From Swiss-Prot:
The glycine cleavage system catalyzes the degradation of glycine. Its EC number is 2.1.2.10. It comes from the Bacteria. GO terms for cellular component: cytosol; glycine cleavage complex. It holds the Pfam family GCV_T_C. GO terms for molecular function: aminomethyltransferase activity; transaminase activity. It is an enzyme of class 2 (transferase). GO terms for biological process: glycine decarboxylation via glycine cleavage system. It catalyses: N(6)-[(R)-S(8)-aminomethyldihydrolipoyl]-L-lysyl-[protein] + (6S)-5,6,7,8-tetrahydrofolate = N(6)-[(R)-dihydrolipoyl]-L-lysyl-[protein] + (6R)-5,10-methylene-5,6,7,8-tetrahydrofolate + NH4(+). The gene is gcvT. This is Aminomethyltransferase. It comes from Francisella tularensis subsp. tularensis (strain WY96-3418).
């Protein structure tokens, strides 16, 4: 099994390790709910070095990414980041990822752990007619520093000059400090940063964060935090069999430049014209119980919906989920252990900056 550069640190902290896409990763360090609440109220740190940073460089880097991605990197200024989907020719989602613009000829993309090899292969397959170099940065580590006190903690572990520059970063902006890249991005619905740095330096950085008030958090808390924030998990909420239209991600497909072609555009436009017969929603269980991926939602007209992600919400203290359901249907219920339990359909975002949105 693959190990991140922080593997020994997790073992020393008595983390419960699990297999995640072939990587030995911490699911929790004792209490998933405590780790979750700490990110909502204070500062938690995550080892996400199983994800991969890939640099796209060359005179046609922007041209290539305008073709490769459904969102339009031409709208990005330097030192800004953009969320988007990479589609196949049928408009199915190959991956969702964040693209960072360093210069006109240098972009960095961070891809999901489970898609590392397939994404890089897709990049290379589609780059053959472009003047670009694709470089997976396998010698880098990634640490997410998340929570309302993330700024305070990170300021304690860097110099005063760097602290001021980090604090000034706006959401979805980033800056390089030598080989370190600090971005004001995250996957929790809280303020925070994702730091991409040389693997040889990550243990010292991790330890200094812990010494200055941060608490480690595992993949369990990462999942409940992103679910509360209404953020998609690739492989659970979407995959190549789904288009952005069916998963509430149409906003991330940029169609404003009608002359731009991108992979999947033709199929996407056809699907858009045809219309989708489902909508992407949040689900809240009205009674005690747990919502899980794969559960059916039944409606009084006989139609069904399906939950793609579900869990107990530590912040809201109820079971929540993300689901696709028929556009017109009433009185939703889920069947849990033979009982029909009422659920409420809400916007697919439950918590932001520690506050309930439902």
């Amino acid at each position: 099994m693959l190990k991140t550069p922080l593997y020994e640190s997790h073992i020393a902290a008595n983390a419960k390790m699990v297999d995640f896409s072939g990587w030995s990763m911490p699911i929790n360090y004792g209490s998933q709910i405590q780790e979750h609440n700490n990110v909502r109220e204070d500062c938690g740190i995550f080892d996400v070095s199983h994800m991969l940073a890939v640099d796209i460089q060359g005179s046609e880097a922007e041209k290539f990414l305008r073709y490769l991605l459904a969102n339009d990197v031409a709208k990005l200024q330097e030192n800004k980041a953009q969320y988007g989907c990479m589609l196949n020719h049928d408009a199915g989602i190959v991956d969702d990822l964040i693209t960072y613009k360093v210069t006109d000829e240098h972009f960095r993309i961070v891809v999901n752990a489970g898609n590392r090899e397939s994404d890089v292969a897709w990049f290379n397959q589609n780059a053959q007619n472009f003047d670009v170099a694709i470089t997976p940065q396998t010698d880098l580590a990634i640490v997410a520093v998340q929570g309302p006190k993330a700024v305070a903690v990170i300021k304690r572990v860097v110099t005063k000059e760097i602290a001021a520059e980090i604090e000034a970063l706006l959401p979805f902006s980033f800056k390089f400090f030598s080989k370190w890249m600090v971005a004001r991005t995250g996957y929790t619905g809280e303020d925070g940063f994702e730091v991409i740095l040389p693997a040889t330096q990550v243990k010292k950085f991790w330890d200094s964060l812990l010494e200055n008030g941060a608490q480690p958090a595992g993949l369990g808390a990462r999942d409940t935090l992103r679910l509360e924030a209404g953020m998609h998990l690739y492989g659970a909420d979407m995959d190549t069999s789904t288009t952005p239209l069916e998963r509430g991600l149409g906003w991330s497909v940029d169609l404003s430049d009608e002359h731009r072609d991108f992979i999947g555009k033709k199929a996407y436009l056809a699907k858009k014209a045809q219309g989708v017969d489902t909508k992407w929603v949040g689900v809240v269980l009205k009674t005690k119980g747990v919502l899980r991926a794969g559960q059916e939602i039944d409606f009084d007209n006989g139609e069904k919906g399906y939950i793609t992600s579900g869990s107990f919400s530590p912040t809201l203290k109820v079971a929540i989920g993300l689901a696709y359901v028929p556009k017109q249907a009433d009185n939703p219920v889920v069947n849990i252990r033979g009982k029909e339990l009422e659920v409420e359909l809400v916007k697919p975002k439950f918590v932001k900056n520690g506050k309930s949105l439902i």
